[in-house]
Design a protein with these regions (language model features):
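Short acidic, S/G/P-rich loop/turn micro-motifs used as interaction or catalytic elements
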Residues: 35, 59-64, 103-104
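Short glycine-rich, basic-tinged beta-strand/loop micro-motifs
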Residues: 47-61
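Long, contiguous hydrophobic alpha-helical segments, chiefly transmembrane helices and signal peptides
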Residues: 53-57, 67-74, 95-97
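N-terminal intrinsically disordered, cationic/polar leader segments
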Residues: 1-42, 46-49
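Structured extramembrane domains adjacent to transmembrane segments
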Residues: 36-44, 57, 94-99
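Charged, alpha-helix-enriched surfaces in structured cytosolic catalytic cores
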Residues: 38, 42, 62-73, 80, ...
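N-terminal start-of-chain detector that recognizes signal peptides
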Residues: 2, 24-27, 57-58, 66-70
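Helix-rich interaction surfaces within compact, conserved domain-sized segments
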Residues: 2-11, 77-122
Length: 122
């Protein structure tokens, strides 16, 4: 009897699939295309389904006016869905909109990083 199991074998994938089932929520990572535009088509529906949207504007750091246009589009999407936008970095180039029924801890986290003094030992 071998004490190690190859978790890549199909039998383990089948067992895991039976226990867990299909994912109901998804993460959508969006960044500007080659023409520096954001394709946000259908994202309002995805947010209403409870999906998470992360927008990376880091490729536009040399284009502040285009970055601002994209930020306004993200803000409009957030207003239409009634959800807040969170900046995940100090440069405000990594933005997040948490979908319906998602909770974001704004007390123990600053810019997406837990502050060690506020974490409990439980």
């Amino acid at each position: 009897n071998d004490s190690f199991h190859d978790l890549g074998k199909e039998i383990w994938a089948e067992r895991t699939h039976k226990l867990i089932g299909e994912a109901e929520r998804f993460v959508h990572y969006i960044k500007p295309d080659d023409l520096h535009r954001l394709n946000l088509d259908g994202m309002g529906h995805n947010l209403a389904q409870g999906n998470l949207v992360i927008v990376d504007l880091g490729s536009l750091t040399h284009m502040p006016s285009q970055q601002e246009v994209c930020r306004r589009r993200i803000q409009t999407l957030a207003q239409q869905t009634g959800l807040p936008v969170f900046a995940l970095n100090e440069a405000d180039t990594l933005l997040m909109i948490a979908g319906r029924n998602m909770r974001v801890d704004t007390e123990k986290h600053k810019l997406g990083v837990a502050q060690w003094s506020q974490l409990s030992d439980d």
